[in-house]
Amino acid sequence: MGKPTLLEPGHLYNVPAEHKNDIPIHYIITWIKQRLPEFGGSIPTSLADRVLIIKSRTGSGKSTALPVHVFRILRNENTHSFQKYLGRSVICTQPRVLTAVTLAKDIGASTHYPDMILGQTVGYQTKPLTEKPNRGLIYATAGVLLAQLHTMTDDEIASRYAFMIIDEAHERALGIDLMLMYIKSMLERMLQRGSIGALRIPFVILTSATIDTYKYSTYFGIGKENIILVEGRQFGVETHWPLYNTNNYIKTACETALTIHKENIHDRPTEADILIFMPGMGEIRFLSMLLSHANMDLAKEKLPLMLILPIDSEAIAQENEAYLGLKAEIKDLWVKNPLTAKVEKPLRRVIVSTVVAETGLTIETLKYVIDPGWNRSVETYYPEWAGGLITRPAAQSRIEQRKGRVGRVFPGHFYPLYTKHVFEQIPAQQYPEIITEGPGAIFLNIVVETIKKNKEGVFKVQEIDMLDPPPTDALASALERAIVGGLLTRGEKGLQLTQLGDIASRFSFLSIEEARMCFSGYFWQAAISDIATILAVVSVVDKKLTNLLDSKQRNGAMLAEAVLAGIPPFLQNMDNAYSNIHLLLADDLLEGLFIFEGFQHAIIYFINNKVNNLAKHLREWCEKKMLKYSAMVQILARREDILNELAVVGLNPFHQWQNRLASANAETFLKRVCTLKQCFYEAYRLNCFCYDEQRLLYTGRNGIHFSYQDTVIKNPSCIVTPKMMLSPVSKQYMEWRLEPSFVSVLDGFVNVDINFLLPRQEIPNILGGGVEDEEEEPPLPIQAFLHKYVKTNFHFSGKSFKELKMKPHQTIKFPETTLINIIPDIPKNVVQTYLEISVCHQYSFKRLIYCETFYTDMDDVQQENSVELIGLPMAAHHLTMHDFNKLYQLLKPDGFLIVYDFHKSQEAFWLHSLQDALGHHTIRRDMDFHTISEWETIFKECGFTPMFNKQPSEHELFIVFKK
């Protein structure tokens, strides 16, 4: 096996002529040492003394040899292994978990680096996996270093790391762009401190095979002398361009792999593997199935078989059978013959992978790469803030990375499934996520870092210092969400963080909406663990709750068993339990909460019974409930992350633990439902949509509209969704439609500010970053109580904001809007439906009551403006005058709807009840109650203004009134 290019002389470019034939790694190490005071260099005075860019072809050793040799600057390679290293570390970031783990293990096992011992001098640190020394060479995902830069001081970072190597720096993920922003700001701050700070400034090395050296050098303000180019590769790669493009790349990929296999039947197993890139798991599963069928044909022809290994991030995190097959030696692997069921040695592995195998990964037995040329990533469109997974042609830089998987240990072959002409037409570089996705969850981090550089402590858009700033429309949308969420406000000199914003900016992985929802949980006294669970479900589950189902035929009814596993005990014996729960909750988010509660119950049950192999039992439980085990584990991990985030900033993650929805009883259930829905509304109010009766569509503030139809609930008047999603309509023509990801119905649960849902107002000057012209602040759609909470409902002790205390707010009381506390036995049989009232949009109702027995066919009721009602079976037999009066007092501040029945058997009861509720005003029993004018007279005499929606029928009348 040849040496990596970095260890072979004669590959240097963009260096002085006398050094062109140097061994690249020696030249690089010498270049670095010349700028280190401990090796005779001068004290750094600019970024040029601490930033180096290395552009080197794939397979050149920049991910392996370079970090090791840089570490040897700090620790001599001849140092005895028993001597513990106590100096500063070298961190080498990787964009993916697979590469971080694999590189560390490979170096620790390599005979070329006897001084690098896994767990002692080399290791890895990722979110799910960690095996690292306290000090040494540490391979880590970019997110690990990003979190450290976010939470640690400059001096703490400098004390930990002497070198930061950002491998695959061309990747433009949000986290990597933010990490580079943090690094640049840190270096500048330490340089400004003079020699005291400059002596320990970490050295930053950016490496990539396809990096735009001009863009990055301009960003860091360094010259050409800080750029080292290493050209050439040890072994050649032959590209096999097709004559024509394919219109079915999955089928073509299978055919190409089978052709390679048959035509190279004499390949040595150590030089035979095939890697096929696919954009997503759906394609991976389909291609794996086709390859399995191909194995059947090979078995019939008595030819050697292929071992098919589907690899994605989930396989790596779980270290499943496919991942273990990837890491094992080919001689230790077996494949089952589909005809004889006997096991035999495979000729080669066919690795079908997503982009997790695109960078930094060396498979020493890999000889062929098949690339369909597609890439799938999240894209977000503004101002709708609608996003989805969009499949587009991969950029040339990504294709070069894929091609670079071969030719590392021996000559390789690259099979693109597109013509050379197509390759030449696609973009050279991938679009950064800050452009395609917008700032998203890192917006507040950008704000804080920008404020740090501003002398007046305000946020100005023009001062954002990133490789690429967010697009204007994305930035305007993010600003609006931060202001509406109470995290940003306009001060005397410009935009500033509020106290809530300061707390939210300390979160590492929470978006504006997620932070706002957590804060709302404290405002409204919700169980924060429920909030964390719901946010975790939204984060993990793509598009719809039914995507939690591990079944090709997904529908809402299949969720029933999973939802019922987590509902409160008092609801479990109800007839038609799932249908009634679905009607009662009218909420995908709460159903997701119950699904997780069921999973959590299973965990506790298995632990209490001390079962062996907990994961196996949980997997079987998920299979029984038709749930994806991997998704449930991800929700569990994400939930833990959110709770940890809250604890880190000093908030109690188990606030109101006793008020969890799953532990509610008949008296508290609907109140807790209303509390959680209020939190949804506070967090996602910009994603509220109202039903337009004329267009039969839901419309929002930004003019977008979409069709939504629940399987049971018909046209609720107001819904909220965490995010709008783009769903493919036609793959052939690349068409998408807008649809809500999760739906929470607000009717009857929450007072919705209708004015807030009007088309959004323009916000002039907000992008100008200041108010120098002293113009009056434009009106913003911000609910007044947000400001009150920021100013009066929080106070902090200490400068670190570690303690957050609530102050009661007398003007904001959570209304008890049900009959639960009046008649405890009724909720067991509560049935919810929707009744259209033409005047209801003029008032904000909480919860409205009617007798279920009076409506046998709700489909006959005219659908106009939806108001939520609670059906109470035989309510007239239970509701006393005292109960009626108590109910009226609960609902009085916001109006009340009476559904009045005229059956003679109940007439006297209702008259007396109504008379008592209205303050003992006399109601004449001899009136003709079938005329609206008579009712209008009664209510005017009582000091009320009645609104009637229609002429009463023979037995029914609907009345809306407000005092």
Swiss-Prot record:
Domain (Helicase ATP-binding) spans 43-229
Per the entry, induction is: Expressed in the late phase of the viral replicative cycle.
**A GO molecular-function term, please?**
RNA helicase activity
Where is ATP bound in this sequence? 56-63
Domain of life, per UniProt, equals Viruses
- Name the residues that span the membrane: 521-541
Give me the reactions it catalyses.
ATP + H2O = ADP + phosphate + H(+)
The EC category is hydrolase
CDD domains referenced in this protein's UniProt entry, alphabetically: DEXHc_RHA-like
Which is one Pfam family of this protein? DEAD
Q: Where is this motif: DEAH box?
A: 167-170
Q: Which family does it belong to?
A: Belongs to the DEAD box helicase family. DEAH subfamily.
Record protein name field: Putative RNA Helicase B962L
Q: What is the lineage of its organism?
A: Viruses, Varidnaviria, Bamfordvirae, Nucleocytoviricota, Pokkesviricetes
